[in-house]
Amino acid sequence: VGLMGPFTTAANLAGVEIILKSMRKDKEGLHKLLDFAADITIEVGRKFVENQIGIGLAEPTASLLSPKQFREFVIPYYVKVMDKWKEWGSRGSGFHICGDTTKLLETFPEMGIRGVSIDSAVDIAVAKDLVGDKLSIMGNVSPIEILRGTPESIEQAVIDCFRKGWDNPRGFTIAPGCDIPVQTSLE
């Protein structure tokens, strides 16, 4: 099941602009909100964890951050969520983040997650080199290719993606780089 992570939950509650301004002007208030958002994430996930249903957390808003900001405003709250879920029997969670997050890749193993789903903007070979020994990688066939491509070009995109990631030490799963667009042909 997919849930929003603490940072995006906080951004949905307060607004992205307010969150970004608070990172400079009201860190204490933002940390309180993020702690609250982490508590929400923990409780929303409780029944899924207790029933051994896998959870993937998404943080589309966090792609706006620098590695330093990510370490301060995202990672501590993921660690809090993962630690609690692991107490309840979870083996960990997957994580998806939108956009070109190459600059953030090296921070992901600090989150306590099992794997990362990366957007098509990130080169799988680079992700594998940076975090493949610590995390499973999922991705990252272009949703635009899936929407607009021919069956042959989509197949080639899947093959190209697989060739880059199949030997990731912690595992690799072929998947779209983000959602499959709703207008995608069933063909």
Q: How should these model regions be labeled?
A:
Residues 1-187:
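Active-site loop segments of alpha/beta catalytic cores
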